[in-house]
């Protein structure tokens, strides 16, 4: 595809999405739910066909030398197909945020002012090897009254196209425009460059992918983005922590899963409790094969307790998202140093304190500048499902618009509505 052809193709996709977004904005809840349930039924009906198509993507990935983890993300197993269908049904069961009016108040002039929740419009979603994102993203955008342009990874092009056909079938069956969900059908990377600059058609970009993808989009995008670059999450064990809670929470925050962006990467411990808190916790970490990168004070304390195999932490370790069985540990003087460290080195994603001191906990959640701040809870809870959002399209550590897990409400905005009885301004 030449550059001219690609630009013409992307412009056509953009125009169709913009037109469809107007129809979606006025679509009834019943029609949107009907579409979601029809798509779920179609996925179950065509499960064998989807697996056959997906097998071709998987075969190409293996032939191209992709590793087992990549192939696993790409594969549409029976479980993955079942989860996609169930996810659609769960989103259909969620309350529809569109049209909700809130904050109504009467003004002295006689007018009544409120805010109505409305769709964002056209959402561009860029993602990599997971074909299930095609359905997750389409479902959330559909339920929130948006149109979406989906640009998945080239490695999943056949799977994504097959899933998009089922989405179009569901939309049409409910009387909604099939163009409300479009998958970019070219694997040309220039399509991403055009998508992120189509300000005339696209209202927001949501990237779902690795750090290199996000960094590129941050440099090149002209369309606003909902994104997070890193998940450098902390837990601070305060001097007034309950040790059982500290061990349980910190073990879970690091070792339940290593790859998610809400996994703890740095553990901070008050010097007043380090000698009691760290040995039992670090014993668990070492038994699970976690490499411990420690500050000098932590090394001295742990070696005195009989630990070996420790690695010195360097300045860059405090800024790393390992996504691996590696944990940086720093002993700090107390709350002030912990807050300062998190705000300096963290990624404003999710941070937690373990403490039984109410005032300390409240100061921590006030002063730590992150999208999610917790008391006596694992950072792994930073998730749309766990927050009761039903589902999420991603997590944002930006400060404008959506912050934290982005569910249906995060794909909407508020407009002011005014009710009057012929009032005029004097």
From Swiss-Prot:
Keywords: Amino-acid biosynthesis, Cytoplasm, NADP, Oxidoreductase, Proline biosynthesis
Functional pathway: Amino-acid biosynthesis; L-proline biosynthesis; L-glutamate 5-semialdehyde from L-glutamate: step 2/2
Major place of residence: cytoplasm
InterPro entries per UniProt: Ald_DH/histidinol_DH, Ald_DH_C, Ald_DH_N, Aldehyde_DH_dom, G-glutamylP_reductase_CS, Glu-5-SA_DH, GPR_dom
Enzyme class: oxidoreductase
GO biological process: L-proline biosynthetic process
Similarity field: Belongs to the gamma-glutamyl phosphate reductase family.
Protein's name in the database: Gamma-glutamyl phosphate reductase
Species of the source: Cupriavidus pinatubonensis (strain JMP 134 / LMG 1197)
Lineage: Bacteria, Pseudomonadati, Pseudomonadota, Betaproteobacteria, Burkholderiales
């Amino acid at each position: 595809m030449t550059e001219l052809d690609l630009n013409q193709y992307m412009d056509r996709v953009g125009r169709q999405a913009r037109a469809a977004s107007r129809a979606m904005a006025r679509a009834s809840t019943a029609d949107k739910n009907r579409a979601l349930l029809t798509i779920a039924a179609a996925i179950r009906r065509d499960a064998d066909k989807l697996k056959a198509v997906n097998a071709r993507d998987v075969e190409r990935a293996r032939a191209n030398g992709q590793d087992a983890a990549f192939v696993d993300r790409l594969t549409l197993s029976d479980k993955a197909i079942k989860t996609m269908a169930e996810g659609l049904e769960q989103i259909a069961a969620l309350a529809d945020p569109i049209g909700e009016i809130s904050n109504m108040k009467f003004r002295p002039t006689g007018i009544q002012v409120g805010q109505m929740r409305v769709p964002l419009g056209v959402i561009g979603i860029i993602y990599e090897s997971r074909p299930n994102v095609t359905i997750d993203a389409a479902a959330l955008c559909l339920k929130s009254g948006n149109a979406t342009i989906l640009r998945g990874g080239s490695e999943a092009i056949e799977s994504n196209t097959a899933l998009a056909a089922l989405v179009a079938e569901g939309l049409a069956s409910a009387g909604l425009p099939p163009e409300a969900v479009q998958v970019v059908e070219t694997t040309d990377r220039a399509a991403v460059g055009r998508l992120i600059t189509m300000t005339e058609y696209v209202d927001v970009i949501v990237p779902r992918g690795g750090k290199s993808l996000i960094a590129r989009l941050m440099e090149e995008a002209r369309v606003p983005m909902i994104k997070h670059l890193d998940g450098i999450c902390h837990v601070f064990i305060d001097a007034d922590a309950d040790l059982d809670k500290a061990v349980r929470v910190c073990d879970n925050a690091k070792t339940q899963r290593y790859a998610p962006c809400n996994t703890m990467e740095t553990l901070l411990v008050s010097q007043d409790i380090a000698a009691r808190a760290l040995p039992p916790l670090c014993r668990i970490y070492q038994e699970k094969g976690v490499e411990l990168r420690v500050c000098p004070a932590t090394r001295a304390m742990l070696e005195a307790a009989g630990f070996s195999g420790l690695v010195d932490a360097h300045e860059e370790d405090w800024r790393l998202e390992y996504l691996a069985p590696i944990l940086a540990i720093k002993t700090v003087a107390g709350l002030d140093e912990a807050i300062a460290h998190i705000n300096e080195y963290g990624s404003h994603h999710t941070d937690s304190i373990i403490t039984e001191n109410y005032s300390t906990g409240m100061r921590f959640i006030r002063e730590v500048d992150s999208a999610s701040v917790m008391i006596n809870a694992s950072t792994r809870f930073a998730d749309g499902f766990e927050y009761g959002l039903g589902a999420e399209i991603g997590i944002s550590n930006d400060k404008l618009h959506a912050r934290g897990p982005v569910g249906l409400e995060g794909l909407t905005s508020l407009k002011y509505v005014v009710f009057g009885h012929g009032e005029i301004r004097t």
